[in-house]
């Protein structure tokens, strides 16, 4: 499980993949604004880069009395190729159900070889900053 704000960081998404994750869920409570366009950009990229499915869940409506803004919903499932294959609306509480072809995980991982072709010896600076 990746939680809300975590989705902005590819390092954690990679660790989940390297540890064998096949399906990653990211529950979120995000309002419209700066990060909305990233909602359908970052998580499909994580799924494709790591060869796993993602369930990307965002709430809908407004939270009173705080009135932080409108939660934009748009929950979806994305496959290991980075393709969104089921999506909910922006405005309604919905139950989104989808079938996952788990064979696709190995197919994508063996085709793209992103884990094999990593060069962790060049990443040391990431942990020093």
Region spans (language model):
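Cysteine/selenocysteine-centered motifs that mediate thiol-based redox chemistry or coordinate metal-sulfur cofactors
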Residues: 14-18, 105-129
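Low-complexity, compositionally biased segments
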Residues: 9, 61, 102-106, 120
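Short amphipathic alpha-helical patches
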Residues: 39-40, 70-77, 104-108, 124, ...
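A short, polar/charged loop-to-alpha-helix boundary motif
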Residues: 92-110
């Amino acid at each position: 499980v990746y939680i809300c704000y975590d989705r902005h960081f590819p390092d954690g998404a990679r660790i989940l993949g390297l540890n064998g994750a096949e399906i990653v869920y990211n529950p979120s409570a995000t309002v419209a604004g700066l990060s909305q366009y990233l909602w359908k950009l970052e998580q499909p990229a994580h799924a494709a880069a790591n060869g796993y499915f993602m369930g990307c869940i965002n709430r809908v409506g407004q939270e009173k009395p705080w009135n932080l803004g409108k939660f934009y919903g748009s929950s979806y499932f994305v496959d290991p190729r980075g393709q969104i294959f089921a999506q909910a609306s922006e405005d309604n509480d919905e139950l989104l159900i989808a079938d996952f072809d788990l064979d696709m995980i190995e197919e994508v991982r063996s085709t793209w070889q992103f884990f094999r072709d990593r060069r962790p010896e060049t990443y040391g600076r990431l942990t020093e900053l």
